[in-house]
């Protein structure tokens, strides 16, 4: 997202900041110094747009004052933008020792013995039928549950083409088809077809995320009523839900579906990196 702001204020010709932005007849903007680099029309003094070839005469070229002002604002805010839109390493001191709650796992999810990895399978695991279990959707919850404090965990989605991670309310529906949306108690980011990313807002929010996203960092701050998602590989911010309700416990949420019959991709909870993090004084309730 920080890179997106930089692209907005760059001249497409010299790639420098558009501090003296001008606009052609068609709306194309570049810096004043780069006007001379534009091709002239064959039989006149008009300038050809690099993208659409619309001719702009001298009177058509106008200063773009709003863009100039935006450049100034973004440059002034850039240090703050970097701190807000990048992952803070100090989040890891709130990393929690998390496992999957088998009692909630769909029967077609094959969960590892250490309760930290799972994949989708063809055969039912014949676990006990109970109300806590997702009986249709390929989902599982994590433990512990959270009612207060700050908590951080990382999920390795590997080569999975279809997945969703985040949190959900303790009371979410687990029977039959579920709707992953904030209205129904799910605060998640997810992927479809390995390249389409979205947050579970209403309506859905498309996300600009690297297709190479393999590890997602999740930071839940119950006191601040927010949950933020990061690309751990480059530290880039993915999305933040704000003003989240705090009327009941939040549960870590995981969903996974095979992209094809041969897909053996695995979704995993990453191990605690800081050895002292598991015993850090975070406020949560165990299962």
From Swiss-Prot:
Keyword set, alphabetical order:
Cytoplasm, Metal-binding, Nucleus, Zinc, Zinc-finger
One Gene Ontology cellular component term attached to this UniProt record is:
cytoplasm
InterPro entries, sorted: B30.2/SPRY (IPR001870), B30.2/SPRY_sf (IPR043136), Butyrophylin_SPRY (IPR003879), ConA-like_dom_sf (IPR013320), PRY (IPR006574), RDM_domain_RFPL (IPR022723), SPRY/PRY_RFPL (IPR037960), SPRY_dom (IPR003877)
GO BP terms: namely: innate immune response; regulation of gene expression
Q: Where in the cell is it found?
A: Cytoplasm; Nucleus
Checking Pfam families in the record gives:
PRY (PF13765), RDM (PF11002), SPRY (PF00622), zf-C3HC4_4 (PF15227)
Query: Where does it mainly reside?
Result: cytoplasm
Which Gene3D superfamilies does this one have? 2.60.120.920, Zinc/RING finger domain, C3HC4 (zinc finger)
Q: Where are the zinc fingers (RING-type)?
A: 11-53
Question: What positions does the domain B30.2/SPRY occupy?
Answer: 78-276
What are the protein's GO molecular function terms?
ubiquitin protein ligase activity; zinc ion binding
Q: How does it assemble?
A: Interacts with PSMB1, UBE2A and CCNB1.
Instruction: Identify this protein by name.
Output: Ret finger protein-like 4A
Give the organism the record lists.
Homo sapiens (Human)
């Amino acid at each position: 997202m920080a890179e997106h702001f930089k692209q907005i204020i760059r001249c497409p010709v010299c790639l420098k900041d558009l501090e003296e932005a001008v606009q052609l007849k068609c709306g194309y903007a570049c810096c004043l110094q780069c006007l001379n680099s534009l091709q002239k029309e064959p039989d006149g003094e008009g300038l050809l747009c690099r993208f659409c070839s619309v001719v702009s005469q001298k009177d058509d070229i106008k200063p773009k004052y709003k863009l100039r002002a935006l450049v100034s604002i973004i440059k002034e805010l850039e240090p703050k933008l970097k701190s807000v839109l990048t992952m803070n390493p100090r989040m890891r001191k709130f990393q929690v020792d998390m496992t999957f709650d088998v009692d909630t796992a769909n029967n077609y999810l094959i969960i590892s013995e250490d309760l930290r990895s799972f994949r989708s399978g063809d055969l039912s695991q014949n676990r006990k039928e109970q109300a806590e279990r997702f009986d249709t959707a390929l989902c599982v919850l994590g433990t512990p549950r959270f009612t207060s404090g700050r908590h951080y965990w990382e999920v390795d989605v590997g080569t999975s083409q279809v997945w969703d991670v985040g949190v959900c309310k303790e009371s979410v529906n687990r029977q039959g088809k579920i709707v992953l949306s904030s209205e129904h108690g799910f605060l998640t980011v997810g992927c479809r077809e390995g390249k389409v990313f979205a947050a579970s807002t209403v309506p859905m929010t498309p996300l600009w995320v690297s297709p190479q996203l393999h590890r997602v960092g999740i930071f839940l701050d119950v006191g601040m009523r927010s949950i933020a998602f990061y690309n751990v590989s480059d530290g880039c911010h993915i999305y933040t839900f704000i003003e989240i309700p705090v009327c009941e416990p939040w549960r870590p949420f995981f969903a996974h579906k095979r992209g094809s019959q041969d897909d053996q991709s695995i979704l995993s909870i990453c191990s605690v990196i800081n050895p002292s993090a598991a015993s850090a004084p975070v406020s949560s309730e165990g299962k």
